[in-house]
Amino acid sequence: MTLTFERPTDTAVAATVDSLRASYGDRTVTTHAVREHHSHGEGMQDAGLPDVVVFPEANEEIASILKLCNQARIPVIAYGTGTSLEGHLKALYGGVCLDLSRMAKVLEINAEDLDCRVQAGVTREQLNADIRHTGLFFPIDPGANASIGGMTATRASGTNAVRYGTMRENILGLTVVTPDGRIIRTGTRARKSSAG
């Protein structure tokens, strides 16, 4: 099976932007400067601009945005801190860029269990600053102050990987929003269970 992609029609994009603006107000941005800022990471690849940048603040908002974009067949690009070297931020067909910088809370720290719960926009440096008082540290260091969401998406590693593993070994569970807008939860805080 061959998948073909094409740029959405101007009508579909305009209707989607209008819907997003109605729901998220000034957190829906279409200025050239903001779109250009969100069109590339640290890599050298050149690509097109997203049609709009939206700043969600909750998983439910992301679910609603993805549901809308899925129905209109509008591409979506997630944006953490823009440190990607791999071209993840390329808006080849325009679309909606989800800037997760407003989802940057450390929700829970369980020092006794050596774990914590964070939102996708939390950066590596922010997490380490927030848990430092417990004597813990987050060992993944890809060299940039990347977001936890971006590091998870790329299975980041770094200079400490030999001793502490990659992102894969340092995540117990995820809350994920699927392209059709469903919110699913994977994993548990339990390190070992009857399920493995």
Q: For the regions a protein language model found, what residue spans apply to each?
A:
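Short beta-strand
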Residues: V29-T30, A78, I140
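N-terminal flexible segment immediately upstream of the FAD-binding catalytic core
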Residues: M1-K67, Q71, T83-L114
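FAD-binding subdomain of flavoenzyme oxidoreductases
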Residues: K105-I109, C116-G196
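Short, ordered loop/turn segments at secondary-structure junctions
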Residues: G80-T83, G143
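Residue-level detector of anion-binding/catalytic polar loops
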Residues: I74-P75, F137
